[in-house]
């Protein structure tokens, strides 16, 4: 077994260690010289700088910026720094003030010459100016009328018909196209207008359809729900109770109201809670159902939301599941083979058709097929074998009939009976003694009633139709 060495933790920088260990005196031996610049390399540079001037080259333990003047290419002269002197302000002369000097500082400088200004003349005696006074009694009249023609001032009012009082307008009758002059108050003015009928440009429809400003051409299809994406888990539910009681798969409660076509919201399941169906574990929401057609079936679908975890921000995270139940398959259309309707062999019945409501004489019927039934003769019901093929003088019509008894059928020629108003005589009870009957003639048939069939015994194979022969009973 290989032992893994513990990972070495990085030590703090020398500057950070120096701040804490210098006071306590627990610094490693390489921290203080590195921070204070007393390493062997620093001392060699300090000793060598005493005899060699290396200031311009920037060799030292500084930041490596080339000193004060910076790096200069070899063979060139370093730049000269010109000091621009700033002019200094002249000093203010401070005059000392003695203790006997006044503390009030005069704003004006003292002067020994005083200018008194011009002298005022004085008048003496009676000589001098003469003062006269005059008075006028005529008032001054000013003519303010300007020269030229007189000016006449007029005013004009412009009325807006949009703000005319509605009660003063006389509305014309419907369909009137002649001009009308409306006279109202002096402020309303006189207006004339004409009513123009509007034409309808609709070429189709009844006029009751909703009007749309931007009609969509063609037929717009509503997008169906996306239930078969990678984000949904497909789960098939075979229980038909999923159609009417979907909440019974999530909880054991039996609610009074269980919505069938709405979204169902459940409480958050507590850990360890059992559910009726394991496929519905951790379900907190079942969306409303949708009926879709998928691969030849009618499908009932619901989308469920699971509660798996909750983030610190309060967001619930869980998978989405598509639960579906197939209602019925949509089978393809079955092709039924139709038999052609051939014309009858008898040319006289070429245009005849079989009418199920027509009154067909029972004496004109001939039974050629097999089947079970009952025939009434004088109030007595006698079991007989009905046919599946009717032969009449109007043509042959085949009526399918399924018999529960295995009756042997043998093909033979169609027998057309002569038209007669009476049925062949059938004795009610057989004679006591057995008589032999010899029949010698042409074609004939035996009435099926004479051969009763027992349900318990197996029927013997017997030909019902004979032709050109002797029969002995």
Curated annotation (Swiss-Prot):
Question: Which cysteines are cross-linked by disulfides?
Answer: 21-27
Q: Which UniProt keywords apply?
A: Capsid protein, Cytoplasmic inwards viral transport, Disulfide bond, DNA-binding, Host endosome, Host Golgi apparatus, Host nucleus, Host-virus interaction, Late protein, Microtubular inwards viral transport, Phosphoprotein, Viral penetration into host nucleus, Virion, Virus entry into host cell
What does the entry's PTM section describe? Highly phosphorylated.
GO MF term list: DNA binding; structural molecule activity
Annotated HAMAP family: PPV_L2 (MF_04003)
Q: What does this protein do?
A: Minor protein of the capsid that localizes along the inner surface of the virion, within the central cavities beneath the L1 pentamers. Plays a role in capsid stabilization through interaction with the major capsid protein L1. Once the virion enters the host cell, L2 escorts the genomic DNA into the nucleus by promoting escape from the endosomal compartments and traffic through the host Golgi network.
Write down what this protein is called. Answer: Minor capsid protein L2
**Species for this entry:** Human papillomavirus 29
Its lineage reads:
Viruses, Monodnaviria, Shotokuvirae, Cossaviricota, Papovaviricetes
Q: Which gene encodes it?
A: L2
């Amino acid at each position: 077994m290989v032992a893994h060495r513990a990972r070495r933790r990085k030590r703090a920088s020398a500057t950070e260690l120096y701040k804490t260990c210098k006071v306590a005196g627990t610094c490693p031996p390489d921290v203080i010289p590195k921070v204070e610049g007393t390493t062997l390399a620093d001392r060699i540079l300090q000793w060598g700088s005493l005899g060699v001037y290396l200031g311009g080259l920037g060799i030292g333990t500084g930041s490596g910026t080339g000193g004060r003047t910076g790096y200069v290419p070899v063979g060139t002269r370093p730049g000269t720094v010109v000091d621009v002197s700033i002019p200094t302000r002249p000093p203010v002369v401070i005059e000392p003030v003695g203790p006997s000097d006044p503390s009030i500082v005069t704003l004006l400088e003292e002067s020994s010459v005083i200018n008194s200004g011009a002298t005022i003349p004085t008048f003496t005696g009676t000589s001098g100016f003469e003062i006269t006074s005059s008075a006028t009694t005529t008032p001054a009249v000013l003519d303010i009328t300007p020269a030229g023609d007189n000016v006449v001032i007029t005013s004009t009012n412009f009325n807006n018909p949009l703000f005319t009082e509605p009660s003063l307008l006389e509305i014309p009758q419907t369909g009137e196209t002649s001009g009308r002059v409306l006279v109202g108050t002096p402020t309303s003015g006189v207006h004339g207008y004409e009513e123009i009928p509007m034409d309808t440009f609709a070429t189709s429809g009844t006029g009751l359809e909703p009007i749309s400003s931007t009609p969509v051409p063609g037929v717009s299809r509503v997008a169906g729900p996306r239930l078969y994406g990678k984000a949904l888990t497909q789960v098939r539910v075979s229980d038909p109770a999923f159609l009417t009681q979907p909440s019974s798969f999530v909880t054991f409660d039996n609610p009074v109201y269980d919505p069938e076509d709405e979204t169902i919201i459940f409480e958050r399941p507590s850990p360890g809670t059992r559910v009726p169906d394991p496929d519905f574990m951790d379900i907190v929401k079942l969306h409303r159902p949708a009926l879709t057609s998928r691969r030849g079936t009618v499908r009932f679908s619901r989308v469920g939301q699971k509660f798996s975890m909750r983030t610190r921000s309060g967001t619930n995270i869980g998978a989405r599941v598509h639960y579906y139940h197939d209602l019925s398959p949509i089978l393809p259309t079955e092709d039924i083979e139709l038999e052609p309707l051939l014309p009858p062999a008898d040319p006289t019945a070429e245009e005849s058709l079989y009418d199920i409501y027509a009154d067909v004489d029972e004496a004109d019927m001939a039974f050629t097929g097999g089947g079970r039934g009952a025939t009434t003769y004088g109030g007595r019901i006698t079991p007989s074998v009905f046919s599946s093929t009717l032969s009449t003088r109007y043509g042959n019509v085949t009526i399918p009939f399924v018999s529960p008894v295995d009756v042997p059928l043998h093909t033979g020629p169609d027998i057309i009976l002569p038209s007669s108003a009476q049925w062949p005589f059938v004795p009610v009870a057989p004679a006591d003694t057995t008589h032999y009957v010899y029949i010698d003639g042409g074609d004939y048939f035996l009435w099926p009633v004479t051969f009763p069939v027992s349900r318990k015994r197996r029927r013997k194979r017997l030909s019902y139709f004979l032709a050109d022969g002797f029969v002995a009973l």
